[in-house]
């Protein structure tokens, strides 16, 4: 029940913020022309959750990539789980996704960082999670641990950017390339 309330509040926050947006935001997940060539023919792991949708219709990135015949080996689930069904602080368990049959590995339980054994059958990790920019959210630390594990195990990692839903632009650093 608490997860549902949190999801409703989060959704209202996103809707409220989107009314202030000055234009159409194109997320990293929607830029398939940029990243599909980097993952085709590779074994892909994903760090995604219920915010990892593509387009205006709520189609999950996992489903989108499976339709593109991308070899998704496993999904690493952050706090609240892959489908967003776990309450805040609740341990997320390993398992299989009931919709796709893809293996789900928890990064919010006994281990916060993928192990070498969990990464051995993966060539590249895609990270696509909408963060709200609040310090108490664990998604940014999940990204840090996954980056660390990829570096330690010589795995590629692609972060699909999801800009702040309130249309904030950081003026401290700008990059001329979407790959920087």
Give the residues covered by each predicted segment.
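N-terminal beta-loop-helix "entrance" segment that forms/cooperates
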Residues: 80-98
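Glycine-rich oxoanion-binding loops at beta->alpha junctions
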Residues: 93-121
């Amino acid at each position: 029940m608490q997860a549902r309330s949190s999801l409703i509040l989060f959704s209202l926050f996103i809707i409220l913020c989107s009314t202030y947006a000055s234009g159409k935001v194109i997320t990293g997940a929607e830029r398939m022309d940029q990243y599909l060539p980097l993952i085709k023919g590779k074994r892909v792991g994903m760090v995604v959750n219920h915010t990892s949708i593509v387009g205006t219709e709520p189609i999950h990135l996992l489903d989108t990539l499976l339709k593109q015949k991308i070899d998704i080996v496993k999904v690493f689930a952050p706090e609240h789980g892959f489908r967003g069904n776990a309450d805040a602080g609740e341990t997320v368990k390993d398992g299989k996704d009931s919709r796709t049959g893809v293996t789900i590995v928890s990064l919010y339980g006994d281990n916060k960082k993928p192990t070498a054994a969990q990464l051995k059958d993966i060539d590249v990790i895609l990270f696509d999670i909408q963060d709200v920019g609040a310090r108490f959210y664990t998604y940014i630390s999940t990204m840090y641990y996954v980056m660390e594990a990829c570096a330690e195990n010589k795995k590629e990692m692609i972060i699909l950017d999801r800009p702040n839903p309130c249309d904030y632009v950081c003026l401290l650093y700008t990059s001329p390339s979407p790959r920087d």
